[in-house]
Amino acid sequence: LYDNGVSPKLLMSGDHGREHYNEVGAMKRYALERSVPSENVFMDHAGFSTYETVYRAKEIFEAKKVVIVTQEYHLYRALYIARQLGLEAYGVAADVRTYGGQSMRDAREVLARCKDFAMCLFKPEPTYLGDPIPVSGNGDVTNDE
C-alpha cells in the first residue's frame, strides 16, 4: 500500500506498555527493512485495544482518512469502530497464512465486538491521550529508541 502510493504515511499501533515488550518498534523495523523512510512511520505506543488505537488515530494523530491493515477476522470490527468515530475508513486483510487457534480468536472476537459496540455508543477516552502528533508531520517524533 505504501509503495503503491495508497498511504503516504504509516501509523503503527500496538502495546508498548512494558519496557521489554514493544509491538510498535517491531512494526517500524519491519517497515524500515522494506525501505519505508523513517519519517513516514509513526508509532502509537498506547494502542492497547482496537478502540483505543482508532480513537488515538483520530484525536492524537489527527487522521481523517485511514486504511486499516489487520487480520480479516478483526478487520470488520476495526472498520466499524473507525466509522463510528467519524473516520473515513477502508480495510485490507493482512492474512498471509492460516493461523493455528483461529477458533479461539473467533470466540474472543464475538465478545470484543459486544464490548466495542458499547464503547462506540458511550465513546470513553482511551487510557492515554496527550498532545497532538499530526500524521501529516514527521514520524520520527514518535521514536523512543
Language-model segment annotations:
Residues 1-107:
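A structural signal for short, hydrophobic/glycine-enriched beta-strand patches
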Residues 90, 112-119, 135-141:
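A general structural signal for short secondary-structure boundary/capping elements
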Residues 124-145:
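Short linear elements at protein peripheries
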